[in-house]
Amino acid sequence: METIFNRNKEEHPEPIKAEVQGQLPTWLQGVLLRNGPGMHTIGDTKYNHWFDGLALLHSFTFKNGEVYYRSKYLRSDTYNCNIEANRIVVSEFGTMAYPDPCKNIFAKAFSYLSHTIPEFTDNCLINIMKTGDDYYATSETNFIRKIDPQTLETLDKVDYSKYVAVNLATSHPHYDSAGNILNMGTSIVDKGRTKYVLFKIPSSVPEKEKKKSCFKHLEVVCSIPSRSLLQPSYYHSFGITENYIVFIEQPFKLDIVKLATAYIRGVNWASCLSFHKEDKTWFHFVDRKTKKEVSTKFYTDALVLYHHINAYEEDGHVVFDIVAYRDNSLYDMFYLKKLDKDFEVNNKLTSIPTCKRFVVPLQYDKDAEVGSNLVKLPTSATAVKEKDGSIYCQPEILCEGIELPRVNYDYNGKKYKYVYATEVQWSPVPTKIAKLNVQTKEVLHWGEDHCWPSEPIFVPSPDAREEDEGVVLTCVVVSEPNKAPFLLILDAKTFKELGRATVNVEMHLDLHGMFIPQNDLGAETE
């Protein structure tokens, strides 16, 4: 356990040929590119939290039935400063560093609240984002790092705040049919307001401006005022349908005064997050055409969520599925001091992740009686009209114990059937992966003893006619000593194993990633 979470992982920048068992589809050509923390000790200093570790990119390249593995640390400014100093000198969300000789690169850790908040790290360890023909490693700060998806080399650094007034941004953007990116970020006390900003990054630029970055053409779609000036909601993702943006303002809040003074108080930024269980969770819907928010107030009970699954419209309703918790215990479980050999026995979630479906009637009879359920679809989810005109929503439970959900992205924002996810139950350690049919609630599983699979990624087969026609890819770390990790390839329809590619390296647990088809990569490589 300590080996998997705490020990620094060696990078393998040159391709290593994997041992392939089984039969891989001939059409599966391209790169599975993933991101996650790989280094938690630098010199004599250690990070406090697993999510603080230095970003380690790794990839599996599929080429004519063969599979090649490589990994490389993201050469961020954070990485370079820390390695040069041989200690942690740049603060992360769960680890405050003192003193910081990189002040010429990173803004002061505190300043007058009306002018700025701490500038964060560029240790982009959470996900991968595609912008036009380029790929970026991302986290939840205002920095992203361009990377080469084939060699894993680190390239340009991009600061969102140069193009849009945000201090934080999600690592789960959405892509429209033209390849444009839609993302959200939080603007903290900008001109006396704290707001959630929805912005669009075009997939291409006009021919006469080819030398300019797509980010120079970034467009603010709209903004949603925070219900609290100094305590905005934390959010990890958001939803999208054909006509609406779905944003959930949850009572898991970031205290800006505490954030601005964390350095001088000797505490980490994570301590500035708190769950307000007595508060409501508010649902916001923004019309993508008019860029205006729906005026009706929709809410539910207090919850914490990280991942939206999918959303769609049906007969005047917006239906959205999320993985939700009753509290914020998940983050606290990943402090490294808790990840010892007895972790699985002693470190339990106090709230199991639950797949919830909310059904929100955007079109309803305004003369409906107070107390009546406005939902007209066949579901146990309800939306009850209150005296003040607001609508109180209760979900349908689709299943319990799943996280890191993915769908066939061709069905993103549309009515769909299938979710692919890890199974976590009362511990955040994934022991299986699952395929959930959200219409029948039937679940298929894959699992083996001592195996910890990563977020499963669906790859559609060419000319697929059905939603689950393709394969599911997951990186599997083995907790049993002397057993090598592997990439698992499942038939998405049957959830049966097609093959696996085993690599004799110490692979790290990762977070998120994407599959890049060969046609999107340009020149072939291993």
From Swiss-Prot:
<comment type="similarity">
    <text>Belongs to the carotenoid oxygenase family.</text>
</comment>
<dbReference type="GO" id="GO:0005829">
    <property type="term" value="C:cytosol"/>
</dbReference>
<keyword id="KW-0408">Iron</keyword>
<dbReference type="GO" id="GO:0004497">
    <property type="term" value="F:monooxygenase activity"/>
</dbReference>
<dbReference type="InterPro" id="IPR004294">
    <property type="entry name" value="Carotenoid_Oase"/>
</dbReference>
<dbReference type="Pfam" id="PF03055">
    <property type="entry name" value="RPE65"/>
</dbReference>
<dbReference type="GO" id="GO:1901810">
    <property type="term" value="P:beta-carotene metabolic process"/>
</dbReference>
<keyword id="KW-0223">Dioxygenase</keyword>
<feature type="binding site">
    <location>
        <position position="512"/>
    </location>
    <ligand>
        <name>Fe cation</name>
    </ligand>
</feature>
<protein>
    <recommendedName>
        <fullName>Beta,beta-carotene 15,15'-dioxygenase</fullName>
        <ecNumber>1.13.11.63</ecNumber>
    </recommendedName>
</protein>
<comment type="pathway">
    <text>Cofactor metabolism; retinol metabolism.</text>
</comment>
<keyword id="KW-0479">Metal-binding</keyword>
<feature type="binding site">
    <location>
        <position position="307"/>
    </location>
    <ligand>
        <name>Fe cation</name>
    </ligand>
</feature>
<dbReference type="GO" id="GO:0032526">
    <property type="term" value="P:response to retinoic acid"/>
</dbReference>
<dbReference type="GO" id="GO:0003834">
    <property type="term" value="F:beta-carotene 15,15'-dioxygenase activity"/>
</dbReference>
<keyword id="KW-0560">Oxidoreductase</keyword>
<dbReference type="GO" id="GO:0042572">
    <property type="term" value="P:retinol metabolic process"/>
</dbReference>
<dbReference type="GO" id="GO:0046872">
    <property type="term" value="F:metal ion binding"/>
</dbReference>
<dbReference type="GO" id="GO:0010436">
    <property type="term" value="F:carotenoid dioxygenase activity"/>
</dbReference>
<dbReference type="GO" id="GO:0001523">
    <property type="term" value="P:retinoid metabolic process"/>
</dbReference>
<comment type="function">
    <text>Symmetrically cleaves beta-carotene into two molecules of retinal using a dioxygenase mechanism.</text>
</comment>
<keyword id="KW-0963">Cytoplasm</keyword>
<feature type="binding site">
    <location>
        <position position="172"/>
    </location>
    <ligand>
        <name>Fe cation</name>
    </ligand>
</feature>
<dbReference type="GO" id="GO:0016121">
    <property type="term" value="P:carotene catabolic process"/>
</dbReference>
<feature type="binding site">
    <location>
        <position position="236"/>
    </location>
    <ligand>
        <name>Fe cation</name>
    </ligand>
</feature>
<keyword id="KW-0443">Lipid metabolism</keyword>
<dbReference type="GO" id="GO:0042574">
    <property type="term" value="P:retinal metabolic process"/>
</dbReference>
